[in-house]
């Protein structure tokens, strides 16, 4: 993947998954969670000592958890979004690094939202990785300053 090391970790068992993450990422600078759909334990986060970025397929704090496109569609949103944030032990609650949005209309169906959202997720994650790896993010309380 463009020369970037990639490791797949199953999310079947949280304890086993977290052990695999530690084993496979000993030399990494940043851990990226994409479609992991699990909350990392506070023990893991306190010992990992490196940035952990999660990409969520909604404009947080709206539509946390699973199936945000379905939630957004059922609410008739006018904007669809993606959020890259630091992972915490609380679901989709970490400090937000980057967000991207795009307008949608009543003509868009769930598949349209997913397609547009996937594009936003890629842009959002790339910008977040770039900002974090270039040390351009400062965390203060549960907020970030990105410069």
Describe each PLM feature range:
Residues 1-147:
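One-carbon transfer enzymes
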